[in-house]
Amino acid sequence: MLLSKYFLPILKEEPSEAQVISHKLMLRSGMIMKQASGLYTWLPLGLKVLKNIENIVRSNMNKVGALEVLMPCIQPAHLWIESGRFEYYGKEMLKFQDRHDNTLLFGPTNEDMITDIFRRNIKSYKDLPKNLYHIQWKFRDEIRPRFGVMRGREFLMKDAYSFDINQENAVNTYNKMYKAYINTFRDLGVFAIPVIADNGPIGGNLSHEFHIIAETGESTIYYDKRFKILKDNPDIDVEEIKSWYAAAEEKHDVNKLSSFPEGITSSKGIEVGHIFYIGSKYSVNMNALINDEYGKLIPVEMSSYGIGISRLAAAIIEANCDKKGIIWPFSVAPFKVSLINLNIHDNKCVELAAKTDKELSNKNIEVLYDDTEARPGSKFATHDLIGSPYQVIIGPKKAANNIVELKDRKTGVLEDIEIENLINYIRI
């Protein structure tokens, strides 16, 4: 992609309304643009990040056999009345009447609708288990939206819902999804810790939140130091991981700490995922019954699994940035390589840039080629800001000898590389 043809509205000054670094950097780098309080347009750079996160989440859901559906963002209120949750959300839930005086709402979550879908289509234990998920925009009318897309009013979520014949099977499914979440965050290039948490308005009696460690996190979490080995050992048994101590602040129990010889540490965290074993709360309230193997009608056992996709974009930045800008993990980066031509009027620079762009693109490595007239200092500032994992810098002196500079955005290390060997240094 040629930068001269791209839509990248960079802000030179820090936006005054931004309180956290991710909000500042998302606005400055042209990822998002504010439309109203808590509402943002996702511009091309930001949308690429959002799609990359979405695709990684989708891939991991598919691997555990979850089936994708797409429920409407507008829901009939009668389902929420039936489940008993309609009044609970209060003004946070946006409600309105259609032309036929039906009460509708902009869904903040989907337990009620998915239960309705299940009860209308599945009647026998033979059709279980089922695990359905969707990725959809949601709306919650926050009293005080803040921190950009971290706590906006409109947000993109992945919601999954599992249905099982009994508690034992439901917990087995829960454990599979627990592990799928660990794998998902690993694939996203972030370190997320699963902590015991409250279920809140969803209900149920087993719950884990997944927190990305970041100094700007709103929550304090306490966890066993062994969690750090998950980065390099993703195949550790789920039951072993769940035996390690990890708790959100409201669940922290100092009396249990002596049982964990490895030591407990605490950090600020940003919640990016939440999973719940719900049990039969919704199936009882909404009459979602199935025939068991003896022909008896019983309520189905449910669990709910959420990941905040738009929130993740901001949380990843909070955990991966410096004074110059964003440092994207390779898997979610909008462009993997920034190709910086320092002199677009030098024939050799143009030749090497074109060759590099073609070779990397042929390897399905997304490249943003800076072919603009901007000065070198301005170009470096722009590409440090947008955070491509690698920068390939082409200047006249070194280009004359078929040499380019390769910069690792995370480490800042610069290397002179012969153009023929460049592809070997891009670690995918």
Curated annotation (Swiss-Prot):
Supply the name of the protein: Proline--tRNA ligase
Q: Which InterPro entries does the UniProt record give?
A: aa-tRNA-synt_IIb, aa-tRNA-synth_II, aa-tRNA-synth_II/BPL/LPL, Anticodon-bd, Anticodon-bd_dom_sf, Pro-tRNA-ligase_IIa, Pro-tRNA-synth_IIa_bac-type, Pro-tRNA_synthetase
Known Pfam families for this protein?
HGTP_anticodon, tRNA-synt_2b
Q: Which domain of life is it from?
A: Bacteria
As for what it does, the entry says: Catalyzes the attachment of proline to tRNA(Pro) in a two-step reaction: proline is first activated by ATP to form Pro-AMP and then transferred to the acceptor end of tRNA(Pro).
For whether the record's keyword set contains Cytoplasm, the answer is: yes
Origin species, per record, is Rickettsia typhi (strain ATCC VR-144 / Wilmington)
Family listed: Belongs to the class-II aminoacyl-tRNA synthetase family. ProS type 2 subfamily.
Which subcellular locations apply to this protein? Answer: Cytoplasm
EC assignment: 6.1.1.15
Q: Which reaction does it catalyse?
A: tRNA(Pro) + L-proline + ATP = L-prolyl-tRNA(Pro) + AMP + diphosphate
Q: Which PROSITE patterns does its entry note?
A: AA_TRNA_LIGASE_II
Which cellular component appears as one GO term in the record?
cytosol
For this entry, list what GO says about its biological process. prolyl-tRNA aminoacylation
As recorded in Swiss-Prot or TrEMBL, the protein's gene is named proS
Instruction: Write the record's keywords in alphabetical order, separated by commas.
Output: Aminoacyl-tRNA synthetase, ATP-binding, Cytoplasm, Ligase, Nucleotide-binding, Protein biosynthesis
Q: Cite a single GO MF annotation.
A: proline-tRNA ligase activity
Task: Note the subunit structure.
Answer: Homodimer.
The keyword Amino-acid biosynthesis belongs to this UniProt entry's keyword annotation? no
Q: Which PANTHER family does this one have?
A: MITOCHONDRIAL RIBOSOME PROTEIN L39/PROLYL-TRNA LIGASE FAMILY MEMBER (PTHR42753), PROLINE--TRNA LIGASE (PTHR42753:SF2)
